[in-house]
Amino acid sequence: MISTSSILVLVVLLACFMAANAQWGYGGYGRGYGGYGGYGRGYGGYGGYGRGYGGYGRGMYGGYGRPYGGYGWGK
């Protein structure tokens, strides 16, 4: 299991990356189709504050969100 501190470090790095690349695309604040970690709802977001594969939102693979072992709302 990934430790909380590791997740926090990852989130900080993602936040820095997103702040430097805020745009409507890969990792932006909007809803880019393949955004790799934005604050929005990227269709294939790999981990951001939205609905990616592992972010604070409704991530699929181990974020703070719902399915697959998230810390938030269970499976």
Swiss-Prot record:
The keyword Oxidoreductase does not apply. Keywords: Amidation, Antibiotic, Antimicrobial, Cleavage on pair of basic residues, Fungicide, Neuropeptide, Repeat, Secreted, Signal. GO terms for biological process: defense response to bacterium; defense response to fungus; defense response to Gram-negative bacterium; killing of cells of another organism; neuropeptide signaling pathway. Residues 1-22 form the signal peptide. The modification Tryptophan amide is found at W73. This is Neuropeptide-like protein 31. It is found in: Secreted. Expressed in hypoderm. Induction: Strongly up-regulated upon D.coniospora infection. Belongs to the YARP (YGGW-amide related peptide) family. It comes from Caenorhabditis elegans. The modification Tyrosine amide is found at Y29, Y39, Y49, Y56, Y64. Its main location: secreted. One of its GO terms (molecular function) is double-stranded DNA binding. The keyword Repeat applies. It comes from the Eukaryota. GO terms for cellular component: extracellular region. Antimicrobial peptides that have antifungal activity against D.coniospora. Has weak antibacterial activity against Gram-positive bacteria M.luteus and Gram-negative E.coli.
